[in-house]
Amino acid sequence: MRNINDYVEKYYNEPFEPYMVQIRKNNIIKQLKKYSHANILEIGCGLSPLFLDFQGFKNMVIVEPGEDFVVNARSLSENKCDIQIFQGFFEDYVDKLKKIAIEFDFIVCSSLIHEIENPQKMLAGIRDVANENTIIHINVPNAQSFHRILAKEIGMIKNIHEQSFQMKLMQRQRTYDIDLLKQEITDSGLVVIDSGTYFIKPFTHNQLQRCLDEKIIDEEVLDGLVKMEKYLPGMGAEIYVNCKKR
């Protein structure tokens, strides 16, 4: 059983993650702009809800289990009548979401299904609240990331799917490569319409944070590493898929 309070406490102290959150969010916004996005459902908003960086929507609904994250999101969205925030696990809100008078154009499930015990249950819930035109965006860390392949080649891990100490600390249940993620999606009754990876991550979160702290690299280098994916396709730090109901 996932301990959400323990997760939230450790999330505050995870090195480099604020940078990764922004890189991840930039890719989500890139995907949003490709499709209809008037009504958006965000499953899990963390400390940085999508509405902070993207305002091109009519309605946004957020479902987030972490109390600290919900308090923060409600404070940031105060007096915004186009944003609804529910506290709880998404799987427990499926019936309520089906009853609200909003047809979702775009559903964001960001950096989540690798952390939960039963991704098929969550994907079934997503399928239930989606309609035939809804785009569902899912992203997860990539087992075939440059930094994991490097770790294998120097003997730090035995295989690219091996769980690291940081993964275990953050209650992450599994590692996906693109084929495993597509299979997970297909098994749930969804169909993948496009996919990709983003951000060439040369080192671990801890190592990258040290590089930034010691001014060995700066955010311009991070921007360059985002652009580097076109030279190393499939080796980005994270995978995304956009999918629909069959």
Q: What residue ranges belong to the model's regions?
A:
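Class I SAM-dependent methyltransferase SAM/SAH-binding core
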Residues: 45-93
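Conserved class I S-adenosyl-L-methionine
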Residues: 1-35, 37-46, 137-160
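A C-terminal cap/extension of S-adenosyl-L-methionine-dependent methyltransferases
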Residues: 4, 183, 194-246
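A conserved beta-strand element that flanks and buttresses the S-adenosyl-L-methionine
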Residues: 108
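Acceptor-substrate binding/catalytic loop of class I
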Residues: 18, 164-180
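A short glycine-rich, Lys/Arg-flanked "PGG" loop and its adjoining helix->strand segment in the class I
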Residues: 120-135
